[in-house]
Amino acid sequence: TLSSSSAASDVYKRQLYIFWEVMAFSSLGLIWYEGSRRARDAGMRYILFHLFGGGAFLAGIIIHYMNTGSIVVGPIESGIGYLLLLIGIGVNTAFIPLHTWLPDSYPKATIAGAVFMSVYTTKTGVYVLARTFSGADAVAYMGGVMVLYGVIFALLQNDVRKLLSYHIVSQVGYMVAGIGIGTYIGVNGGIAHVFNHILYKALLFMCMGAVIFRTGKNNLTELGGLAKRMPVTMITCVIAALSISGVVGFNGYVSKGMVIQAGAVSYTHLTLPTKRIV
């Protein structure tokens, strides 16, 4: 797809800003293609958020160029350009409170579109974050907030795709925290979690898409007893759920464990009080 190739171009060609915007506008098509009024409204809110983020990102690039004479992707010195770049990246990466486009737009997209968007949209932001803000304490703390916020709001949802969307915020929080910690194990754990999340979150969106397609229902309170009717979907959904839960033997256990270990070692002032209580 155009969106996926744009994400790849971010990584390999470094034409970052241009393809950053191409990805935002091509993702809009995945939302609007659903055709409903709700999808059109959600798509408009999505693109307004990303225009704001793209504007902040571009302004940060310009200020950084004026200060350094370079537009090479890499670590950024503190200043207004630093802040603007962080805001621009934060929109794509679903920083709190810049995250609201995500649970608003993903459930309104087409079933297949939501799968694609769950794979690349926030992950491109994580990649740029790793290139520019690795080791920033503010980023590490933001990751921790995202982990807690996302999972709490996911538990409050009835719509299955909205639940998964809020949980993306939580899972991206692990990636952001690992990058913010900045140690070898933290950054590698965060990047490993990117790839693991692509696998199990896409699988969960495909499973829920199959359920919605088969039953025509989105709400958990209206679903149940599907194991006999959809055994393959049930098995794959359980595999993805065990992975996202970090159960031993599944991929989520490895990458989450790396990030948690990095945090425990680097932020002892936060972990020591917990150890004393235990």
Which residues does each PLM region occupy?
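Hydrophobic transmembrane alpha-helices and their helix-loop junctions in integral membrane proteins
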Residues: 6-16, 26-270, 276
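Short, well-ordered junction/capping motifs at the entry into regular secondary structure
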Residues: 1-2
